[in-house]
């Protein structure tokens, strides 16, 4: 069984509506309840920033820093894991811009935010993701890449490198440049990183599909059939990566006039999509009811949590924002049971603590009240 990694203490300074907060946390289920706008999701956002990226809201750091503060913010977490305790801190100082985020691990400055993935993996579900299957493909790619990152820590940097190269190519296209050497250099980098991204996505989908197949087909959360739509993802499953890179590089070179007319790059992993079907109903997820879509999404995340534990040797930390609002009583009880079985730390939020009543005695209940957090009465 994977070793549990959990946050035992979380400290926030000038973060969102928290001027200063320090809370001790239990290793299993943690329930944050309180009124809308009290700051429950802010706590989940803080935890989500203990991994690379902009967190579950994808907000600019200027928005994350507390209004009325000095413009900076700091987060600190004490982790208890298989290798003992680890201290992780991140934030920005006063006057630092969007690129000024710093990470410290056990007091030492980390090389990059990716170093945090050595110590914890975090995956989240938020109400904004309820429209994942009916919304734009970009949202599904972002969700997929977050799942990949949890088992392949290098994926985030590859995605950043690809995006940077593509922005450079798009600038050349819109500027009307005909400098073949510049194009060739950028397109070579796009081919290398783009194929690596596609291969990582394809591998994640293969592994996750196999994990879903291992689970009972009569469970509370319907099994999903998942696949990828994209030329590169299809090719890397059947051809050597070096051959796919060369094909993609030639396609980029041959498509310059087309892309110049469009003003952007029209081929690559940034155009791919994650396809999901409700297996029992043999129906595309986007055609399912809202409740069925939510159940499918929860099932995928729980299967991914199992996969992450097996692949990394540590249980992921789950952030489940307003998770109980759209699940019936049976599925809520099933979710809580599965979380216990996974032995992972799971942070859940809701306006009504009663929705989590079946967890009484088995979870830590905390009430959030506009900048303060304390034990929930009668919990």
UniProtKB/Swiss-Prot annotation:
It is found in: Cytoplasm. GO terms for biological process: DNA replication; DNA synthesis involved in DNA repair; double-strand break repair; SOS response. The keyword Transmembrane does not apply. Keywords: ATP-binding, Cytoplasm, DNA damage, DNA repair, DNA replication, DNA-binding, Nucleotide-binding, SOS response. GO terms for molecular function: ATP binding; ATP hydrolysis activity; single-stranded DNA binding. Its main location: cytoplasm. The keyword Transmembrane helix does not apply. One of its GO terms (cellular component) is cytoplasm. Pfam families: SMC_N. InterPro entries: AAA+_ATPase, DNA-binding_RecF, DNA-binding_RecF_CS, P-loop_NTPase, RecF/RecN/SMC_N, RecF_2. ATP binds at residues 34-41. Belongs to the RecF family. The RecF protein is involved in DNA metabolism; it is required for DNA replication and normal SOS inducibility. RecF binds preferentially to single-stranded, linear DNA. It also seems to bind ATP. NCBIfam families: recf. This is DNA replication and repair protein RecF. It comes from Mesorhizobium japonicum (strain LMG 29417 / CECT 9101 / MAFF 303099) (Mesorhizobium loti (strain MAFF 303099)). The lineage of its organism: Bacteria, Pseudomonadati, Pseudomonadota, Alphaproteobacteria, Hyphomicrobiales. The gene is recF.
């Amino acid at each position: 069984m994977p070793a549990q990694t959990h946050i035992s203490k979380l400290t926030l300074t000038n973060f969102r509506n928290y001027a200063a907060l320090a809370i001790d946390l239990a290793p299993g289920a943690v329930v944050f309840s309180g009124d809308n706008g009290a700051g429950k999701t802010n706590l989940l956002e803080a935890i989500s920033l203990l991994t690379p990226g902009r967190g579950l809201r994808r907000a600019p750091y200027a928005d994350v820093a507390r209004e009325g503060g000095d413009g900076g913010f700091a987060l600190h977490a004490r982790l208890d894991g298989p290798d003992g305790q680890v201290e992780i801190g991140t934030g920005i100082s006063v006057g630092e811009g969007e690129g000024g985020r710093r990470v410290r691990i056990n007091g030492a400055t980390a090389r990059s935010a990716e170093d945090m993935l050595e110590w914890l993996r975090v995956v989240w579900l938020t109400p904004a993701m309820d429209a994942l299957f009916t919304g734009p493909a970009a949202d599904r790619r972002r969700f997929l890449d977050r799942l990949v990152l949890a088992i392949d820590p290098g994926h985030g940097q590859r995605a950043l490198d690809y995006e940077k190269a593509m922005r450079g190519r798009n600038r050349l296209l819109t500027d009307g440049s005909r400098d073949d050497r510049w194009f060739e250099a950028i397109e070579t980098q796009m081919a290398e990183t783009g194929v690596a991204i596609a291969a990582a996505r394809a591998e994640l989908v293969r592994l996750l599909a196999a994990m879903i197949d291992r689970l009972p087909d009569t469970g509370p959360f319907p099994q999903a059939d998942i696949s990828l739509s994209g030329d590169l993802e299809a090719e890397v499953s059947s051809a050597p990566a070096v051959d796919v890179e060369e094909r993609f590089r030639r396609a980029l070179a041959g498509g310059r006039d087309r892309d110049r007319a469009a003003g952007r790059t029209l081929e690559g992993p940034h155009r791919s999509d994650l396809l999901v079907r409700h297996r029992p109903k043999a129906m595309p997820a986007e055609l399912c009811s809202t409740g069925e879509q939510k159940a499918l999404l929860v099932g995928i995340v729980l299967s991914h949590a199992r996969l992450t534990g097996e692949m990394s040797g540590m249980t992921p930390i789950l952030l489940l924002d307003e998770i109980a609002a759209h699940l019936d009583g049976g599925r809520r009880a099933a979710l809580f049971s599965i979380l216990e079985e996974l032995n992972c730390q799971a942070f859940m939020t809701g306006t009504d603590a009663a929705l989590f009543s079946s967890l009484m005695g088995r979870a830590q209940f905390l009430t959030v009240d506009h900048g303060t957090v304390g034990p929930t009465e009668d919990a």
